Amino acid sequence: MTMELQRPREAAALTLSLLDLTNLREDCTPQQIATLCQRAHTEFGNTAAICIWPRFVAQARAAFGKDHTIRIATVVNFPSGDLDVATVVAETEAAIGDGADEIDLVIPYRKFMAGDESAVAEMIAAVRKACAAPVLLKVILETGELKDKALIRRASEIAIAEGADFIKTSTGKVAVNATLEAADIMLQAIRDSKKKVGFKPAGGIGTVEDATLYLRLAETIMAPNWAMPSTFRFGASGVLDDVLNVLAGGEPAKAASGY
């Protein structure tokens, strides 16, 4: 285990640098987005990104201007995964036009669970085509709904094959979100692919201690110091409070506080 993950302050600093600070509440307001943009800049450094609804991307881009130090991530086909390909491509193109740096795409997981792998491949390929470099594509598998280990593995493989830059566990909108079990399967799929693909657990990561468990798992499966903003993100909101508390010298929280 690397030294960073043995010390809470170092683990907190790493978590901060990997954080997609998220507000995907249905009742999110422009004022909350303004606050989110401000919170992404901390006295200890910046988060990797913010993750917001498409309707707020233009506002966030206006706040950040031409500075892409903190990236703007948004969601498409979210959270249901049920939209048609043309609609999702249009969502993606509009979000990029508004200034999004990263697209978090939900796969049509219900079709996938019914045996339709081609629907997943087609959706990812179409959105991948719409995400010209340097826009990143993160593919949300909704592992808490897939449940089955073989399905999670296969969804990971399809996403990687179709050009995902990251594979992400969850929307945060279902009963079961990120789990270490799903993370283990997804990280092994990344390792076995021998491709440069990142991993993003989302939902239920509320403390530095929670985050450290995922970082240790990534280190075990991938390599020491593998986790960096180009390979690993956390989708969370509440964890920032504990990160800042620990970095300020406070005691780490024990209990997760959710998405």
From Swiss-Prot:
<comment type="pathway">
    <text>Carbohydrate degradation; 2-deoxy-D-ribose 1-phosphate degradation; D-glyceraldehyde 3-phosphate and acetaldehyde from 2-deoxy-alpha-D-ribose 1-phosphate: step 2/2.</text>
</comment>
<comment type="function">
    <text>Catalyzes a reversible aldol reaction between acetaldehyde and D-glyceraldehyde 3-phosphate to generate 2-deoxy-D-ribose 5-phosphate.</text>
</comment>
<keyword id="KW-0963">Cytoplasm</keyword>
<dbReference type="GO" id="GO:0005737">
    <property type="term" value="C:cytoplasm"/>
</dbReference>
<dbReference type="InterPro" id="IPR011343">
    <property type="entry name" value="DeoC"/>
</dbReference>
<dbReference type="GO" id="GO:0004139">
    <property type="term" value="F:deoxyribose-phosphate aldolase activity"/>
</dbReference>
<keyword id="KW-0456">Lyase</keyword>
<dbReference type="GO" id="GO:0009264">
    <property type="term" value="P:deoxyribonucleotide catabolic process"/>
</dbReference>
<dbReference type="GO" id="GO:0006018">
    <property type="term" value="P:2-deoxyribose 1-phosphate catabolic process"/>
</dbReference>
<feature type="active site" description="Proton donor/acceptor">
    <location>
        <position position="104"/>
    </location>
</feature>
<protein>
    <recommendedName>
        <fullName>Deoxyribose-phosphate aldolase</fullName>
        <ecNumber>4.1.2.4</ecNumber>
    </recommendedName>
</protein>
<dbReference type="GO" id="GO:0016052">
    <property type="term" value="P:carbohydrate catabolic process"/>
</dbReference>
<feature type="active site" description="Proton donor/acceptor">
    <location>
        <position position="200"/>
    </location>
</feature>
<keyword id="KW-0704">Schiff base</keyword>
<dbReference type="InterPro" id="IPR002915">
    <property type="entry name" value="DeoC/FbaB/LacD_aldolase"/>
</dbReference>
<dbReference type="InterPro" id="IPR023649">
    <property type="entry name" value="DeoC_typeII"/>
</dbReference>
<comment type="similarity">
    <text>Belongs to the DeoC/FbaB aldolase family. DeoC type 2 subfamily.</text>
</comment>
<dbReference type="InterPro" id="IPR013785">
    <property type="entry name" value="Aldolase_TIM"/>
</dbReference>
<dbReference type="Pfam" id="PF01791">
    <property type="entry name" value="DeoC"/>
</dbReference>
<feature type="active site" description="Schiff-base intermediate with acetaldehyde">
    <location>
        <position position="168"/>
    </location>
</feature>
